């Protein structure tokens, strides 16, 4: 009987020491998960630090993003993405100017009209 109680006490102590995902801290009304780093397919929320703390991020999985589009998620604008956006706008302007040439060659059915859209680095 004493060995049974001792075994039970050891298992109860070991159950508390086991590391793993027994409890996952949630954020943004149980939409996101608090993690140190987000996976590439997950979106990092700006307002998740309230629930997760300063050292963790609130990561929203891709399958839950479509169901809850109302929360605020900001993607970071980098210098590379701004340069790429400007290059795309320049290409679109060039393609729009080349449309009369496409009409004379009979390729108008393959060409769609593109308009240059300005990109601000703050959004």
From Swiss-Prot:
Residues 1-20 form the signal peptide. Residues 21-63 are annotated as: In vitro binds to LPS, mediates antimicrobial activity and inhibits LPS-mediated inflammation. It is found in: Secreted. Keywords: Antibiotic, Antimicrobial, Cleavage on pair of basic residues, Defensin, Disulfide bond, Fertilization, Secreted, Signal. One of its GO terms (molecular function) is peptidase inhibitor activity. Its main location: secreted. O-glycosylated; glycans contain sialic acids alpha(2,3)-linked to galactose and N-acetylgalactosamine. The C-terminal O-glycosylation contributes substantially to the sperm glyocalyx. Highly glycosylated atypical beta-defensin involved in several aspects of sperm function. Facilitates sperm transport in the female reproductive tract and contributes to sperm protection against immunodetection; both functions are probably implicating the negative surface charge provided by its O-linked oligosaccharides in the sperm glycocalyx. Involved in binding of sperm to oviductal epithelial cells to form a sperm reservoir until ovulation. This is Beta-defensin 126. It comes from Macaca fascicularis.
